[in-house]
Amino acid sequence: QGLYWFDTQPSVAKAARDHAEQLREDPDTAWNEIVRRLKAAEGKGRGFFSHIHIAPDTAADIPDMDTVRLVIVHPRLRRRKNDGAESEVVKWIRAAVESKGAAQRTHRNTLVFLVADSDELERLENTTRNYLGWKMVQDSAEQLNLSKQQSNQADSWVNRLNDTINSNIRSTYMWMLYPEQVDPTRPFELVAEKTSDSDGKTLTERVFTKIKRDGQLITELAPTMLGMTLHSELGALWDRVDDMTVGDLWGYFTQYAYMPRLASRTVLDDALRSVIDVMLMPGEQFALATGKDEEGHYQGLILPPSSAATPPVVTDNTLVVKWEVAKAQLDADDALEAAYEDGEVIMASDHSETTIVSWPASRVTVVNNDAVSGVGVSEAEASSTAAVELPDIHYTGSVVIKSDRYVRMVNNIIEEVIDR
């Protein structure tokens, strides 16, 4: 006769498997476990972005701030390789960029998103359910009356699946998305780039490295690039104004997706402070001022480069001034100063006789072919002078350059002599 033996202890593998299957009907439980791990691993990654927003339930949970932040999208939203504008995750991200709840979002150029890959997420969800199944068995060892061997088996599976989940999260969250607007007259597009998990970095560091390498997050801004931005991306506005405050300029960087994405306000301030040492070319030129009086006269005006200037203290009220406007004021200031000074002279010669005339040329006065300095000429003397048109002959000349105003004086020479 056959003998049969019945094990009175439950099969721990079957108990874990049954619980994991039940969780298929409750996806929130697995998602909550994934989110918990994301917060534990990525919540301290603010050294790369000003803030990390992990799995916000709605776009209203993402603050409208003027600093660049990373949004790790909730695992209920996933991206397939060929997803278009009508996919659920793309529509959610677009809505998050455009609005914060019922209000329009102001700082649209400050958000970067990280999204799970659809295929990888399915594997992660399955692993997470299996982990939770074995975790239930481990936590219920006493109630299930598990043997020492069964408890060890549960512990082994929990540890193994725990490590697998952490590894799978890194390979699952691979899609970086951010708004880009090539044409300011058209709506922004969402650019999707895959990030690599081959370098052992956290998700936050991986995204930061990728977006910085792609030139989509600027951590250091050269003054020349800032000048080019004023003349190109902001050209339509820059052409209509004489100046703008740094506070307004920073707002343009954070609001519009066609502007470079600066990592922080410090990046802009550093570029402005360092411009005093940089020779700017046409298409890059701008000046700085601490303010302007009621008559529109700029105060603390700096026309780069300026060896005599000290790095300015940049505030929201600091003015970025159009180069031509700043130069016109400085030229007028120099002309007024020169009216009371001697020594800035040009030695001009027509190879027959030498004539001494004052600088700048706009103040040259000639009386009976004898040039006199415009400096200190009285109204009576000026009324008795007669302007004489010099013959079209060859002239040579020299000018004394002051070290504290060499840029403006050289520019004057170029405009008055070379460009004429």
Specify the residue positions occupied by each region the protein language model found.
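Extended alpha-helical scaffold and adjacent linker segments that couple domains
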Residues: 1-419
